[in-house]
Amino acid sequence: MARIGDGGDLLKCSFCGKSQKQVKKLIAGPGVYICDECIDLCNEIIEEELAETSEVRWEELPKPREIYEFLESYVVGQEAAKKALSVAVYNHYKRVQAGENGGAQGREDAIELAKSNILLLGPTGSGKTLLAQTLARMLNVPFAIADATALTEAGYVGEDVENILLKLIQAADYDVKKAETGIIYIDEIDKVARKSENPSITRDVSGEGVQQALLKILEGTTASVPPQGGRKHPHQEFIQIDTTNVLFIVGGAFAGLEKIIEGRAGAKGIGFGAQIRSKREIESKDQFEQVMPEDLVKFGMIPEFIGRLPVITSVHNLDREALLQILVEPRNALVKQYERLFELDGVELDFERGALEAIADQAILRQTGARGLRAIMEEVLQGVMYEVPSRKDVARVVITADVVLSNVNPTLIPRDSRGRGPGEQKTA
């Protein structure tokens, strides 16, 4: 029996005016009522608005030249890699845009655009991770980094490949719609190469098994992701995420691959008439610029995995000049960062040219590339960063080559008797 209001009429929804008999449920509030149909409509409106705010604004998708110029302001050198990434990323999100617009306005003969994941080859400290991070920052999409060495095949001790997707969902604040257009960078992929070129009869759970497990999410599938990660909570509800529009950038150092490339290209030279190239001549070029898919298969990557990474590009070792540029030129250059740290204490920090050259030389000796520059800077500045904040008499710190090479103390320039530094102007 329907409830009757104070006026003798059936209760009605305050929003659509339908009576209690016309709807499944009527929820009462202080002086108002809302039906289940209006609640569903409100939910749809909210979901649409959230989807609009979470999606990339595709009409503003930057062109390849604009992407390249943005990368140029953060990453020194690696021109070929920056161009290849700019084109690949533009084409990927153009493909996503075409899919959201209904595939060429719903034409029956619409061409389905294939996914173009990226394989990025190059030595450690050459900028692979920074390139991927910078792309995600420019496009304002969620970004996650995963280490392939921590992954194992499902059912074994280690991380499942689905945990990579969980990191992306977390980066998107659990907005699955937004995560589905994000970028995932998988590092150290060369460490999951199988032990030999021939398929193994024994189970390789951290090598070939990981490559097999990655195939589906690279290609595009609806994956079930445990919200708490791992297998410790078997009864948890899974998050469904479609990886069709997730861009995967896969990177690795691939040490030893250059020998496989040289062997295929006949770099060693056999016979009287063969052209023999010197080691210096080979090293002067990008060691990975001639890579072919069969070289990667011989290295230990399975053909199906390489087939899902159609864009292959490389970064090269950074020379002394490139390391010097990295120290001072990019928007977030290391020297600028440390100058800002000292500025917050009211102290100027000056690096002489010789000091910067010595830091670059140390990074080359350690074979750590750009990643090693910060560690060297920390070693050089640790003592003065400990001392200077407690002293009010220091106006400027000068770092010379001897500070870097011989571990001598930096030059501390004091303020004058009125507390001014050497570069400060007198006030009237």
UniProtKB/Swiss-Prot annotation:
Q: Which UniProt keywords apply?
A: ATP-binding, Chaperone, Metal-binding, Nucleotide-binding, Zinc
Q: Which residues bind Zn(2+)?
A: C13, C16, C35, C38
The biological process GO terms on file are: cell division; proteolysis involved in protein catabolic process
- Source organism: Streptomyces coelicolor (strain ATCC BAA-471 / A3(2) / M145)
Q: What is this protein called?
A: ATP-dependent Clp protease ATP-binding subunit ClpX
Molecular function (GO) terms for this protein are: ATP binding; ATP hydrolysis activity; ATP-dependent protein folding chaperone; protein dimerization activity; unfolded protein binding; zinc ion binding
Family recorded in the similarity comment: Belongs to the ClpX chaperone family.
One Gene Ontology cellular component: HslUV protease complex
Task: Describe the task this protein carries out.
Answer: ATP-dependent specificity component of the Clp protease. It directs the protease to specific substrates. Can perform chaperone functions in the absence of ClpP.
